Amino acid sequence: MKENFRVIIPSAKLVPEELQKLGKLPAIIYPINQKIAFDYIYDQYKNLHAKVDIICYENADKVERRLRKVIGNEIKVRRLPELHDLGYTILYAIENIDEPVVINFADTIVMDRIVDISGDAFFYQEDYMSETWTYFDEESGIVTHIYDKEAINEEIKKKLFVGVFKIINTHDFRECLRNAVQQKNKKMNSFYYALERV
């Protein structure tokens, strides 16, 4: 990816309760082996000199303390004014950004480089549907339907979003996201609602 871009890492909520034996931590500073999640994610982008915005809310002070040595011109921790859904968090992050963005969920470490893929992109894998993840249908590379953490009574294999997305036209995506956040769709997170319509 030759153009400048911004990396957005949403980390507004604490890790799930079953992972809190190490403390009530946001995913971005959750320990993995001898590092934290941030170290693994940042390794994917540091040689590209991309700016990184980490968006926090719950225990944001812990994130600021843990990352104080790396926060600077290229890496910023931004605090949400209030907590809503993922779509609101990402809208807040891209509100004044016009360059392309990579959205990398704080709990997602993918060793493949999404920046080497041309155009809009996201990573996915196939698995049996569960209400834990967000799945989708696609036709010829176009997302046609999204199942956001829907309960299912039968074993059906679908594609699921892994948590790394690249958006080239940030302006258009921001407008879709703004509409999705304002609609407050109760069946689907506004981020996925916008993805389905962009």
Sequence positions of predicted segments:
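Conserved N-terminal catalytic core of the sugar/cofactor nucleotidyltransferase
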Residues: 1-18, 30-31, 35-100, 183
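Short glycine-/acidic-enriched loop or helix-start segments at secondary-structure transitions
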Residues: 18-20, 63-66, 89, 112-115, ...
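Catalytic core and acceptor-binding pocket of nucleotide-sugar-dependent glycosyltransferases
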Residues: 180-198
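Structural motif
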Residues: 10-13, 55-59, 105-107, 125-127, ...
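Short alpha-helical oligomerization interface
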Residues: 23-27
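Short beta-strand-to-loop acidic/aromatic patch adjacent to the donor-nucleotide binding site
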Residues: 99-109
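Conserved core of the sugar-phosphate nucleotidyltransferase
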Residues: 109-185
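Short, conserved catalytic or adaptor-binding loops enriched in Gly and charged residues
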Residues: 67-71, 137-138, 196-198
